Regions:
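C-terminal motif of bacterial Sec signal peptides marking the signal peptidase cleavage site
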Residues: 16-19
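Extracytoplasmic cysteine-anchoring/structural motifs
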Residues: 21-27, 71, 75-162
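Start-of-domain marker
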Residues: 21-77
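Alpha-helical transmembrane segments
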Residues: 11-14
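Generic detector of solvent-exposed, compositionally biased contiguous segments
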Residues: 5, 65-67, 131
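Bacterial N-terminal signal peptides that target proteins for export
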Residues: 1-7
Length: 162
């Protein structure tokens, strides 16, 4: 009878331990595309601003006036078959060039656990772009997932200072 007073504490403690899950969600659960500058223009001395248009029609700046960059990461949409990005390059003299980059991709839902947030992985199918300030863009790694160690796209900017 004297042990019955510990029953509520024991029930709460058992409930606490039984509610814990052995599945851990990944800490790095953001799917980002890694861009690496290649060629003669690394790092890029000009200010680089990258924006996109959201599904509701408003603009969103993804990278704001980055200077002396040689790589950067950008988020990937999960509800559109292609991402349209606007690369604006501006130097200290004031001239500005804007290139449009279209990344065609295929989205795949990725399931870890019921406890984890949903995520999408992607396969880059094709990249097209205007050629005002960008010379070329090469697909280096087509699978976009949690692993952001290797560059997915290599960007070759034109050199205007030669």
């Amino acid at each position: 009878m004297k042990y019955l007073r510990f029953a509520p504490i024991l029930i709460v403690a058992m409930g606490f331990f039984l509610s814990c899950s052995s599945i851990n969600c990944p800490l790095n659960n953001r799917v980002m595309t890694v861009y690496k500058l290649a060629g003669d223009v690394t790092p890029l001395a000009d200010a680089l601003t990258i924006s996109t248009t959201r599904t509701n029609g408003t603009d969103s700046v993804l990278l704001n006036q980055a200077v002396n960059v040689d790589s950067f990461s950008l988020p990937v949409s999960y509800n559109r078959p292609q991402d349209v990005l606007y690369f604006q390059r501006q130097n200290t003299a004031g001239w500005s060039l804007t290139d449009t980059v279209v990344i065609e991709k295929q989205d795949f839902p990725h399931f870890e656990s019921i406890d984890c947030n949903p995520s999408y992985f992607h396969v880059i199918k094709r990249v097209s772009h205007t050629r005002l300030g960008i010379d070329s863009i090469v697909i280096n790694k087509e699978n976009v997932n949690y692993d952001a160690k290797e560059a997915h796209l290599l960007v070759y900017f034109k050199n205007f200072y030669q």
